[in-house]
């Protein structure tokens, strides 16, 4: 079998799909994208395609090494996202060629189901509470919320009180019937992160995500030393080499690699194993589309330390398309009591409505995240 063609489709809401074709008619799908930089990743995919045409898609490990090491410069979000989508598509092809789901190629099931969590937006506590109530009605009991708005390097107590008040109201409304993680989104610098985490401890969030940016990862062990709350991070780390440093330094209780940003299934399988050796849990980051989610699920079902799976159904970013709009076999993604179950069709197990993909790709939006500024005009982290 040989790779014959690579096609990319930028799609609403903010996704990009990749199709790899072979001379035997087997097609694989991947999802290479950096939200807000889809065109840049698309260019990288097509540049890398020179290494792919005519190659045997079954040699996934060799292809991965060529894509990563053939260029003198490597790593980073753009290249690793391009590699990620290609890698997903290659696993899809291999599973289809052999007639088995990808999790079987990775050693088989280590669990029968995985708990999913849902992101809940809203600027006011009442909006967040209403969103949680709606999701509990369809079986969710685990959520992720914004931990705060933009916050200065040193900010006032009113900002801290406002962030804590939202969490307090949510905990009062639901008690211990739900669990929720708080995503700081890298908006907080180390001095305020210490204060905010301390103030939030009485409300027992499930985890604190990205209390500071990955560039400030040396603060993760320092922050972890001052709190009993689990610290999570990893969506902005792009290879096992990025994770090697934070795992060795300690501090993280949960890692959150993104299978569309961190080299795909091949790389994240290794990252998960590294984390297990450090007694660190895995909760793959996935606010993206169905191919990314399918890739995450195959990893969840073979990694013993996987504990939670993010998914984007109903997320506020999904303007113009919902998670399963491009999927034919929607029933395979059905959840029971907030849990996903293994995808048992060959390959990634996601059947793409290619006709709809082609049509919707004709007018794909160029999504950009907003640019936030502090009251003094300086740029703030979004």
Swiss-Prot record:
Site note Transition state stabilizer applies to 310
User: What's the EC number here?
Assistant: 4.2.1.6
A single GO BP: D-galactonate catabolic process
Per the UniProt record, the site (Increases basicity of active site His) maps to 258
General remark: Reaction proceeds via an anti dehydration.
Q: Under what name is this protein listed? A: D-galactonate dehydratase
Annotated Mg(2+) binding lies at 183, 209, 235
Provide the cofactor list for this protein. Answer: Mg(2+)
| Gene3D superfamilies, per the entry | Enolase-like C-terminal domain, Enolase-like, N-terminal domain
- SMART domains tied to this protein: MR_MLE
Cited CDD domains: D-galactonate_dehydratase (cd03325)
Q: Which reaction does it catalyse?
A: D-galactonate = 2-dehydro-3-deoxy-D-galactonate + H2O
Which pathway does the database say it acts in?
Carbohydrate acid metabolism; D-galactonate degradation; D-glyceraldehyde 3-phosphate and pyruvate from D-galactonate: step 1/3
How are cofactors bound according to the entry's free-text note? Binds 1 Mg(2+) ion per subunit.
GO molecular function, a single term: magnesium ion binding
According to its UniProt record, which protein family does this protein belong to? Belongs to the mandelate racemase/muconate lactonizing enzyme family. GalD subfamily.
Superkingdom field: Bacteria
Residues at the active site: 185 (proton donor), 285 (proton acceptor)
Pfam families, per this entry? MR_MLE_C, MR_MLE_N
What this protein is reported to do is described as:
Catalyzes the dehydration of D-galactonate to 2-keto-3-deoxy-D-galactonate.
UniProt keyword terms in alphabetical order: Lyase, Magnesium, Metal-binding
Q: Which InterPro entries match?
A: DgoD-like, Enolase-like_C_sf, Enolase-like_N, Enolase_C-like, Galactonate_deHydtase, Mandel_Rmase/mucon_lact_enz_CS, Mandelate_racemase_C, Mandelate_racemase_N_dom
